[in-house]
């Protein structure tokens, strides 16, 4: 099956590292034009350089903090200046803050909502009219399996992701008559910079950290970012033209719910 994004342009937030970088790379190597958005200019420049090595489409970087309305507007303006249109949105920016409810402050909750939920809402609001007008659009919200099966001590992350899943379903219903397809991809244990940082914080080797995490993964290993990106690329292409309003676990079978 040929997966092509030739002639399509995409915004990938949180696109300089991990899953976002893998998705941007997959899109670009499939012929799409890609604007990657990240806060750090140095990591952004490095990511753009690396993606261009295998890209068939254009690649640009936009330094912006999508946790703010100003930052989202900057990301949108950068993509429009580079490509003149946006066909695909990947709302990937976010962190995985967790902890006991009793220590969850309003500030921590709002920070997580701003980066995960409001960033997606604002970017979709900006791009939505042109997607409807062209009768073609793809929106992919990157959440995690906690959106379906939240565990104790998993707020604020699981709470904001659950809201993101509801947002996905609402948009899918409104977009379907206009061929704007909206889906969510739910992260399980996937290779990412956050695992490297977590291992450093614990003062243990990365391999030991990963081994402990993957004990309850039926496939017995951590997933590769490229494996996650493959599904995103499929959903963004014409090959995924009859899929909307769903949330797909990419977790090696770890989630207790389908």
Question: PLM features: residue spans?
Answer:
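Short C-terminal tail/terminal secondary-structure segment
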Residues: 1-3, 19, 149, 233, ...
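Conserved glycine-rich cofactor-binding loop
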Residues: 9, 16-18
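Conserved mid-core segment of classical short-chain dehydrogenase/reductases
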Residues: 73, 77, 96-110, 153-156
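Substrate-binding pocket helix/loop in short-chain dehydrogenase/reductase
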Residues: 100-101, 105-113, 139, 209, ...
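Active-site loop immediately N-terminal to the catalytic Tyr-X3-Lys motif
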Residues: 101-102, 149-155, 177, 220, ...
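Active-site helix of classical SDR
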Residues: 124, 160-161, 168
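Alpha-helical segment proximal to the catalytic Tyr-Lys
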Residues: 129, 173-177, 241
């Amino acid at each position: 099956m040929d997966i092509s994004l030739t002639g399509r342009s995409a915004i990938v937030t949180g696109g300089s590292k991990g899953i976002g970088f893998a998705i941007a790379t997959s899109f670009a190597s499939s012929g799409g034009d890609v604007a990657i958005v990240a806060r750090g200019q140095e990591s952004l420049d490095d990511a753009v350089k690396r993606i261009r090595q295998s890209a068939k489409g254009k690649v640009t970087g936009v330094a912006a903090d999508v946790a703010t309305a100003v930052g989202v507007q900057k990301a949108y303006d950068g993509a429009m200046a580079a490509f003149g249109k946006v066909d695909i949105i990947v709302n990937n920016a976010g962190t995985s803050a967790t902890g006991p409810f009793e220590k969850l402050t309003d500030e921590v909750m709002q920070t997580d909502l701003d980066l995960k939920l409001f960033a997606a809402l604002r970017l979709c609001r900006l791009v939505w009219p042109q997607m409807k007008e062209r009768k073609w659009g793809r929106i992919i919200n990157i959440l995690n399996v906690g959106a379906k099966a939240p565990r104790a001590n998993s707020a604020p992350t699981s709470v904001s992701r659950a809201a993101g899943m509801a947002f996905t379903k609402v948009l899918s219903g409104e977009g379907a008559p206009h061929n704007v397809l909206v889906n969510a991809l739910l992260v399980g244990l996937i290779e990412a910079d956050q695992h490297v940082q977590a291992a450093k914080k614990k003062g243990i080797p990365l391999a030991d950290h990963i081994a402990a995490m993957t004990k309850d993964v039926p496939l017995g290993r951590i997933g590769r970012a490229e494996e996650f990106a493959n599904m995103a690329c499929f959903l963004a292409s014409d090959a995924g033209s009859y899929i909307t309003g769903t949330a797909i676990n990419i977790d090696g079978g770890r989630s207790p719910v389908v």
